[in-house]
Structures are given as structure tokens and as C-alpha cells.
Design a protein with these regions (language model features):
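A glycine/threonine-rich phosphate-anchoring loop and its flanking beta-alpha core
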Residues: 16, 114-206
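Hydrophobic/aromatic beta-strand patches that form the interior of the parallel beta-sheet core
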Residues: 66-68, 101, 126-128, 163-166, ...
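ATP/NTP phosphate-donor binding region
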Residues: 1-99
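Active-site segments that bind and position negatively charged phosphate/pyrophosphate groups
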Residues: 199-313
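Solvent-exposed alpha-helices and their adjacent loops that cap or buttress functional pockets
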Residues: 7, 93-95, 118-120, 147-148, ...
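Short glycine/serine/threonine-rich phosphate/pyrophosphate-binding segments
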Residues: 107-114, 135-136, 253
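C-terminal charged capping/lid subdomain of soluble metabolic enzymes
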Residues: 2, 184-186, 285-362
């Protein structure tokens, strides 16, 4: 078992990585939190695959377990689902010494974490991420949130889990679209600060998913360790942590305009990275050839190349609600080159012309 620690003083927590780890969930939780009750939150994609195994492991060590299964998809990450979870927790009389366990991808982790942060002013929280996106990104760092019709992740909190269990075997059941969903975030890490990861992806992308699964341990370690280091330095997203949002300004605007029913988040991030890098390279802000190198990798990974047919004015309007904004100022993450990024203060006018064909297909 490999363990990466997110170092946050008294709130530090371990991220354990091991094949077959879901079967040890009960043992790991009891060792960390003692004799408690556990509410498992999952969705109707993940529950049929892993709920029985996880609940059985908990009951085997004497934990008291209740569970709830929600519809899958980004549309579930809403205030109505939050209300459903609050009612469920009250119905089962969870106390402050008990735990909410998120079993699923980024939507379930983000959603389940908010009642963990706020029910009874905070209960224990455990993440069991089963998608690539959740394992490398959303389960690490304590961001929990739901969406509003006006934008993504607009109601949320910073609430660190006490334990994260990453089982790479769960990635074998991902459909191709969920696999690409995670790859968008993986490429992001290589772009902003880990060129060794970027090269690892370049070396293996041609072999498809099989080749990437052959080095999945290295990929997970690169991503999780990088994010843990960033979170340790900037837990509340006021500076350095903003760099993790490379590609996300455009991505969130696309998702908002599509009402979270279009492409997967990681696919939208890939488009955002393509567009912003093409634009900054043309402006002389990014080393020549960076955009082409990024596009070659994203193409090899099967990521989308074209922005959806959304009016540019709608995308620009959605950007005004971006969480990285400060007043009318928008903070955009750009690349100097692969592996080196910066935060650029600007405004939405920076993105004028982003839907031009030269920026969305090279």
C-alpha cells in the first residue's frame, strides 16, 4: 500500500492507494475513526458495482451502516439533492462522531462532502473515489460543493476528509467517457507543473487505455502528490491553488451554458486548455510550439477538439461568475511552457474571439 499525506497540521490526513482496497474499507475506517455509524452515499452507476462489497466490509468489523443511492450525473449536484441528504441523515440519527462516506466519482464526493461539513456543524468524512477524475483531483483537498442554475460549484465549503482510499481496480469498470473525464485533469497536472508526468503520458498515449492502465500507479502518484503539495501551501484557494484551475474558466462556462448535460467535465477542461493555450501563444505569452504539443497529446487521448455551438457572448457572460474572479477582475491560468504556469489578472475581454476556428482546431 502506498500512502500520501496531505500535511495540514492537526487536520492532516492519509490517502492510501492499493489495488483491491475497497474490500478493506471497513477495516480502514474502524482503525481511523473507531466504532461509529456510517452513512454511505453513492449513485446508481457505482452502487451496483461496489456498494455490496463496501457495506459488507463495514458490517464485518461491526460498523453500523445505512446507505442512499442517488441518480448519477452532474445534475444531481444540486440543492434538491442536498436537502434529500440532510433528511436522510436526520432519519438515521447520525451523530457528530459518525461519518459520511462518499462512494463514487466527483459528483458524489462534492455533494456528500457538503452535508458532512454542515450537518451538526460537521461530521467525519471519508472519500472512496471510484473514477479517475475523483482519484486524481476532486477527492483531494477538501473542496465540497453543489451547483446552481447560474453556475458550477457556487454553494460550497472547504472541508477536508479524514481518510481517502484509492483503489485503482475500480477504474477498470469505467466507460470510455468517464475515462476521458479523468484524463483531462491528469493532463492538466502535467501542463501546470509536472513535465515528467506530461512525458509519461506522451510515451503511453499511443497504446491507448491498456498502456495507460499499465502505468496507472505512477500516474496516480504524480497527480495526488502534486495536488497534496499545493493544498498544503494554499488550502483555501487564494493563490497557488488557483493554478489547479488551468483550463477551467472556459470549461465551467461551457458546462454552465450546456446546463451540465453536455460533455464531461474533464473533456470540457481539455477544450479549455486547448483554447487558452492557443490564445496565449498567439499573444506571445506562451512558448511557441506549446499549443501543438498539447494538442498532439490530447488528440492521442481521444479528447474533443471543437467547442460546442454556444454563442460567444453566452460563454463570456458565464465567465463573470467564475470563482477565480475578484470584482470585475478575472484571474486566468496560463502556461509559460509545458510544466510552468502563472496566474494572470485580466478580465473577460481577454477571451474575446475565443470561438474563432484557429483557436479550437489546429
Amino acid at each position: 500500500m502506498q500512502t500520501i499525506t496531505v500535511p495540514l497540521g492537526e487536520r492532516s490526513y492519509p490517502i492510501h492507494i492499493e489495488r483491491g482496497l475497497l474490500a478493506k474499507t471497513g477495516e480502514m475506517i474502524r482503525e481511523k475513526l473507531g466504532d461509529i455509524a456510517v452513512a454511505v452515499v453513492s449513485d446508481d452507476h457505482v452502487a451496483p458495482l461496489y456498494m455490496e462489497e463496501v457495506v459488507s466490509s463495514m458490517e464485518k468489523v461491526g460498523l453500523r451502516v445505512c446507505s442512499i443511492v442517488l441518480p448519477h450525473g452532474e445534475q444531481t449536484k444540486c440543492l434538491k439533492s442536498l436537502e434529500t441528504l440532510y433528511a436522510f441523515l436526520c432519519e438515521h440519527h447520525l451523530t457528530r462522531k459518525d461519518a459520511i462516506v462518499a462512494l463514487g466519482g466527483g459528483v458524489i464526493g462534492d455533494l456528500a462532502g457538503l452535508p458532512a461539513a454542515t450537518s451538526l456543524r460537521g461530521v467525519h468524512f471519508v472519500q472512496l473515489p471510484t473514477t479517475l477524475l475523483a482519484q486524481v483531483d476532486s477527492s483531494v483537498g477538501g473542496k465540497v460543493a453543489v451547483d446552481l442554475p447560474q453556475g458550477k460549484n457556487l454553494v460550497g465549503a472547504f472541508y477536508q476528509p479524514e481518510l481517502v482510499l484509492v483503489d485503482p481496480d475500480s477504474l477498470r469498470t469505467l466507460t470510455d467517457d468517464f475515462w476521458r473525464d479523468g484524463l483531462g485533469e491528469v493532463v492538466k497536472y502535467g501542463c501546470i507543473g509536472d513535465e515528467a508526468l506530461f512525458r509519461l503520458l506522451e510515451e503511453n498515449a499511443g497504446g491507448g487505455r491498456t498502456a495507460l492502465m499499465g502505468v496507472i500507479g505512477e500516474i496516480l502518484t504524480h497527480c495526488i502528490q502534486y495536488k497534496a503539495n499545493i493544498v498544503a501551501q494554499d488550502e483555501h484557494d487564494t493563490g497557488l491553488r488557483m493554478t489547479l484551475n488551468f483550463g477551467h474558466t472556459i470549461a465551467h462556462a461551457v458546462e454552465t451554458c450546456q446546463h451540465y448535460t453536455g460533455m464531461r467535465h474533464g473533456e470540457a477542461v481539455a477544450l479549455g486548455m486547448r483554447v487558452i493555450t492557443a490564445m496565449t501563444e498567439e499573444k506571445g505569452m506562451t512558448e511557441q510550439g506549446t499549443s501543438a504539443r498539447l494538442n498532439r497529446l490530447l488528440d492521442a487521448l481521444g479528447m474533443p477538439r471543437r467547442l460546442p455551438a454556444i454563442p460567444e457572448k453566452d460563454l463570456l457572460n458565464a465567465m463573470t461568475l467564475d470563482k477565480k474572479s475578484a470584482g470585475k477582475q478575472l484571474r486566468v491560468i496560463t502556461l509559460d511552457k509545458i510544466g510552468v504556469c502563472r496566474i494572470v489578472p485580466t478580465d473577460v475581454d481577454f477571451f474575446q474571439g475565443m470561438t474563432a476556428q484557429k483557436f479550437v482546431q489546429n
